[in-house]
Amino acid sequence: MEASGGVGGAFLKDVVAYVEVWSSKGTENYSRTFAKQLEDMGATVSKTLNKQVTHVIFKDGYQSTWDKAQKTGAKLVSVLWVEKCRMAGALVDESLFPAVNTDEHLPNLSRKKHKCMQPKDFILKTPENDKRLQKKFEKMAEELQRQKAALDDDVPVLLFESPRSLVYSSPVNVMKRRLQDMKEKRENLSPTSSQMLEQSQQNPCVSLFETSLNISHQPLSSDESFASGSHSSFGDSCGDQERKLGRSANEMTTVTCPSSPVLRASSFYGSASPNHLRQPRPQKAPDSPSKESINCQKDATGAVADSERKQAAGVSQGVPDEKLCLSPTMSIIEEHQVRLGPKNSSAKRKRAADLGSSPKGKLKKRYKRKSALAIQLFKSDQSPPSTIRLIPGTPDVEASSYEDYFSPDNLKERNSERLPPEAQQLASPSLFHCRGLSKWERRNMLEMCDFTCIGEKHRSISSISDLISKSASSLEKPVKEEVNTASTCLLLVETSANDSPGLCSQPGPQLRDDTGPEGSSHPDTLSSSAHHITPLKGNSTETRDPGDGKGSPKEGSTPPASASPEDEVHICNLSLGEDCNVEKSVEEKENIATGYSESVKNGPGRPDPSDSSCTGLVRPQQKPKKSEKEEKPTRTLVMTSMPSEKQTLIIQVVSTLKGFSFAPEVCETTTHVLVGKSARTLNVLMGIARGCWILSYEWVLLSLELGHWISEEPFELSETFPAAPICRLERHLSTQQYQGTLFANQPKMFIAPASSPPRAKLCELVLLCGGQVSPAPQLASLIIGPYKGKKKARIQYLSEKWVLDSITQHKICDFNNYQLLQ
């Protein structure tokens, strides 16, 4: 029993405790519960075992903790010491509750390992509560300050002047140093436009390769990185080619360098003005080259350029209304040529001169051989026409452009090589953009395409749309079939449960909303899907009612003279319209007495799963049986007047030691009632009436200490509830279902509807103690509770407390002390 003055005091204020309490298997840590109790009593709980600790609450903990506690001289006590201090309200002698170390004499190899299966509380680490993180932040701050101090004026600075803007500030001396380093490392520097013009005159190979190599470097963000990357990628290859072949500068001007497949593009406005180069969307104002250099180049390559222009003019005259469109890769090249400005102008003129100087027959032969690879460009009204042809190269160079060829940007270009002109004209609008196509653009492009020329079978867009609609309908079919199948199975279970007498009825979630209040199916549902229903196998000759047993009385029937108390309760409830939740069938009561009650394992309203009549039914929501070790225990335990922290500890102990399941109220399977505070509750009275153990909280604590359930008798609350051991012994000695005899010799009682505790509970208590309950006040000699009707002299009107006190003391109390005022 709990001491009245010991609760809430700070009588352990001088105690500094370290708690280490584990389960006997070493998988559950109960330290937090006992630490909370110590804090409530005023003790200081330390998270670490240090020199300030005076008491160590130890149970099945680490051997290192035990050794350290003995070394420091702290007092090792068990969990019972904490409970005794709480009950006594004062500091109890520690020698009465010494801690036990079961692993002290065991070898190191056989010691149990502690592995807590409880989830830890997640605490977000911040510099304020984590020293390691704080040190890391301080070190980062010191490093940042050191780097700032080491910065000088020569280091480039990134300036974020406004959102989404970045200014790169680089002093001149840094650029000089960078150029010098690049020269020493023999790297190709990023040339200016004038340097690129000179380079194109000296080395025509470079000007021919620029266009093809711009493809792979277009995604680079800055022009500087683009120029340095492109020139470093092809400069060395051209130099090596010159050294290998040993060609002179004159030979290089007449022969095209075959180091890569070159895309030769000549842009012009139209046949009327073919001499001017097209520069769409200029982003920078390029430095225009001098007229002298242009005229000089024009004189040197005039004849060849004229022939080239005539040829291009012939192409444009052949298709005067069409705009020859660039693929995404070509538009990337053209856009970057505009950025580079005059360099590409000179490169184009120089390239025209180089190609023009080659023999005429060779060119014709080459064009005939590669006519299938020519990229025909398409119609557009927005930009002037231009022609692009693919010039062949050696296998080595083709291997070097392997990545570019298989890049996603060139996918449509490769597809366009295989498509005829009609299909390409329809696909042309999507090829202007350098970016990827959106879903909307892709769909529009597919709608515009004519696929009649592709493959052997001709299929129109309407047939394709029909195919798509068919596929969509085929995708929807399985879903509908699954729904139909589910509804068929549902109806099959319903009809087999209600219509066919040879099948076992199975109430439950399978019927859902399709069954009426009595379990019958709706007629329209059955008639609409009657053709889906097929008979089930596995018939039996017996049907079972899931609600009541064989011996349960029917409604409206008159009870026999020798009716059991359960039958009387049933009749009482039917006449009054209230459910007392007490009545059970005779068959179920006998099953509980013999030890195989289905009400615990399968619930009171479910049929026996081992019944052979249910073998033909499919139960999707019922899980397969597990082994007997994992089955739910048949004994239930009820807690009453128990604080929440104690409830948590009891739940953990029961889950560790096994053998019990929890129930919210005392029922026919309850064997133990744990009482937190010695207060008379309905669960305590129900436990007494059913012959249960009425135990204190210490029984669980000592069982936890020893690692198994111990004898209950020393912890039975027989002083507070004298009837508890008497009823328990009567239940133990009874060979059949236990039935109390306290009210067996009392006259019939009528429980008033306004009684407190509730009428149903009082009815159950009276019947469990052998009394008789009358459904009407005219048939009773005792009326329990406040009665508003006309009172008669022959009837005793007693308070509800008479029933409660009689059950608690296990004797019939005097009526005179419980008479209600007339």
Curated annotation (Swiss-Prot):
The name this protein goes by in its record: Microcephalin
Domain BRCT per the UniProt entry, residue ranges: 10-99, 627-717, 738-820
Subcellular location, record wording: Cytoplasm, Cytoskeleton, Microtubule organizing center, Centrosome
Sequence ranges of Polar residues compositional bias: 189-203, 219-235, 522-541
Biological function: Implicated in chromosome condensation and DNA damage induced cellular responses. May play a role in neurogenesis and regulation of the size of the cerebral cortex.
Gene this protein is translated from: Mcph1
Keywords: Cytoplasm, Cytoskeleton, Phosphoprotein, Repeat
Database matches in InterPro entries: BRCT_dom, BRCT_dom_sf, Microcephalin-like, Microcephalin_mammal
Subunit structure, interactors included: Interacts with CDC27 and maybe other components of the APC/C complex. Interacts with histone variant H2AX under DNA damage conditions.
Taxonomic source organism: Mus musculus
PTM sites of type Phosphoserine: 273, 290, 327
